[in-house]
């Protein structure tokens, strides 16, 4: 049997090259079998791209990455035009191969020791008041990247004392306690970790992840920092039922999670998991009502909602759809 070719550091694998390395075989979608995108998912392009270009130039100048670009988020134009961005630290190559995600897979380079300072300076220059910091999975690092998160938060606050920081962290597989010890030295203002989907779909959608680990990460952080809101996000359209999603919401509340985002999965390419259905806005409204009933302090539920979409407004408890 042929072994997979050893990956070279810094080489990005995308699409077929990426998903060919997961345990569940994905048959590339043919155009005539792909579901037609409904009108409620049409995104209006901005009248001007000037602000988008300014933010992209600032990121390139400092060698930084935004998950908005790397994950092909449909809200990039809207968020960039509002002067907000979700920064992705620890490089743009992920050690996982989730077939719903458009971020590249491969062997990452060593963390950039200068990134925390460059990130803080960029945020200051962009005059941001609320930032989201996320990362790729770094299973190659002993702490999963936790120290780099803490370093970034510390440097950001040095130059931006009034800023609010939300972290969207990976699952720190096999090293939760060690990671939480480090993160506790520089806790964020909002702690976010996405469950992504219902547990029965993890094998196909989140190979290498574990539903209970993710719940435990959220709960253990909350036990250490009871005054910091915890948050999680889910996608719909991967074959789950509304009842399955409802149970995930109950599980999140049982693990003391207070904030929720729920949006529609969109297939990045024909080599990724197909969209099994487009969920109508009315069904998102029903799940929003359930989330409110269960006691979430804020639930953003709608087709175009993403974990970081208007995160500043979400943190203020304002309605986001």
Swiss-Prot record:
Ligand binding ([4Fe-4S] cluster 1): 68, 73, 79, 308
Compartments reported by the entry: Cytoplasm
Cofactor note: Binds 2 [4Fe-4S] clusters per subunit. One cluster is coordinated with 3 cysteines and an exchangeable S-adenosyl-L-methionine.
Group of enzyme by EC: transferase
CDD domains: Radical_SAM
Entry keywords, A to Z: 4Fe-4S, Cytoplasm, Iron, Iron-sulfur, Metal-binding, S-adenosyl-L-methionine, Transferase
GO cellular component, as recorded: cytoplasm
TM stretches of this protein: none
Binding site for [4Fe-4S] cluster 2: 94, 98, 101
Domain Radical SAM core span(s) in chain numbering: 80-297
Pfam families: Radical_SAM
Pathway(s): Protein modification; protein lipoylation via endogenous pathway; protein N(6)-(lipoyl)lysine from octanoyl-[acyl-carrier-protein]: step 2/2
InterPro entries: Aldolase_TIM, Elp3/MiaA/NifB-like_rSAM, Lipoyl_synth, rSAM
Domain of life: Bacteria
Cystine bridges: none
UniProt cross-references to Gene3D superfamilies, sorted A to Z: Aldolase class I
Family statement drawn from the similarity comment of this UniProt entry: Belongs to the radical SAM superfamily. Lipoyl synthase family.
Name used for this protein in its record: Lipoyl synthase
Organism (species): Shewanella baltica (strain OS185)
């Amino acid at each position: 049997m042929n072994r997979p070719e050893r990956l070279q550091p810094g080489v990005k694998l995308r699409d077929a090259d990426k998903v060919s390395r997961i345990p569940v075989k994905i048959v590339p979608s043919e155009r005539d079998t792909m579901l037609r995108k409904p009108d409620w998912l049409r995104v209006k392009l901005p009248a001007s791209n000037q602000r988008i270009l300014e933010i992209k130039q600032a990121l390139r100048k400092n060698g930084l990455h935004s998950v908005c670009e790397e994950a092909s988020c449909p809200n990039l134009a809207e968020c960039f035009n509002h002067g907000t961005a979700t920064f992705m630290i620890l490089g743009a190559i992920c050690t996982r191969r989730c077939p719903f995600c458009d971020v590249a897979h491969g062997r990452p380079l060593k963390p950039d020791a200068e990134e925390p300072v460059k990130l803080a300076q960029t945020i200051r220059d962009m005059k941001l008041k609320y930032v989201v910091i996320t990362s790729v999975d770094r299973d190659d690092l002993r702490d999963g990247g936790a120290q780099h998160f803490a370093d970034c938060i510390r440097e950001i606050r040095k130059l931006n004392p009034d800023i609010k920081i939300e972290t969207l962290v990976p699952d720190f597989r096999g090293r939760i306690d060690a990671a939480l010890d480090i993160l506790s030295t520089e806790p964020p203002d909002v702690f976010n970790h996405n469950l992504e989907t219902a547990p029965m779909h993890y094998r196909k959608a989140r190979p290498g992840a574990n539903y209970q680990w993710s719940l435990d990460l959220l709960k253990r952080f909350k036990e250490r920092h009871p005054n910091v809101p915890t948050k999680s996000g889910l996608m719909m359209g991967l074959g789950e039922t509304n009842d399955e999603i409802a149970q995930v919401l109950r599980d999140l509340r049982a693990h003391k999670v207070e904030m929720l985002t729920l949006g529609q999965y969109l297939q990045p390419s024909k080599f990724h998991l197909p969209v099994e259905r487009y969920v109508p806005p009315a069904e998102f409204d029903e799940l929003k009502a359930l989330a409110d009933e269960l006691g979430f302090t804020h639930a953003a539920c709608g087709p175009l909602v993403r974990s970081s979409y208007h995160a500043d407004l979400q943190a203020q408890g304002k309605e986001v759809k």
